[in-house]
Amino acid sequence: IPNTSNRVDFILTGEDENHHQNYVLVELKQWEKAEVTDIPQLVRTFVGGGYHNVDHPSRQAESYDLMMKSMNEGIYGNNIGGYPCAYLHNYEQKHPEPLLDDRYKDLVRQAPVYFQNDYGKLEETFRKYVGHGKGMAILYEIANGKIRPSKKLVECIDSLYQGNDDFILIDEQNVAYQTILKKSEDLDHKSTIIVKGGPGTGKS
């Protein structure tokens, strides 16, 4: 992901049946279960040796996709379409399934979640968007695309200075942001929240 230490897990490139250039961005998760939280866009699962609130996989995939579309000239300069999704290959879907809870429906609509037994659906997604060849040429454009903000991103930053909320937060940034918002809504008294992080991690 441009200007971050984050990496996309998996990308397939190719054309669809209408000869549009596309890529499918896949966020891979080894999770086996997850729980809903009362904090928007976040779920609770076992990572890093304990249970933590983290971005919903769909939200993570979509944020990575938005960053690439905003910063990679090979993508926005060639009108390459991006289709994010998440594949939880160790996760057997529950009924009801926490990750498909109504509170996450907008996220899942933007970036579908595929579970352990959904490999057929994932294959259909690949065939639909990138199953008609020319993948190497498209991958070359992405891999060699210059990292510079698109006009759309520049307009977005200008919009921020006008007081609008348009920023793309990824991973821990979004977890911190959503947690702070929830805390501020729940508290009925003045409070101080300290955000800890190294240089360039997005604290501001």
What are these regions (language model features)?
Residues 165-191:
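N-terminal pre-P-loop "Q-motif" helix
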Residues 1-143:
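Accessory nucleic-acid engagement/destabilization modules that flank
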Residues 199:
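The conserved Walker
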Residues 195:
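Hydrophobic anchor at the beta1->P-loop junction of P-loop NTPases
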Residues 154-164, 189-190:
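Short glycine/proline-rich turn/loop motifs
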Residues 203:
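Conserved lysine of the Walker
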Residues 112-116, 150, 170:
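General structural signal for secondary-structure boundaries
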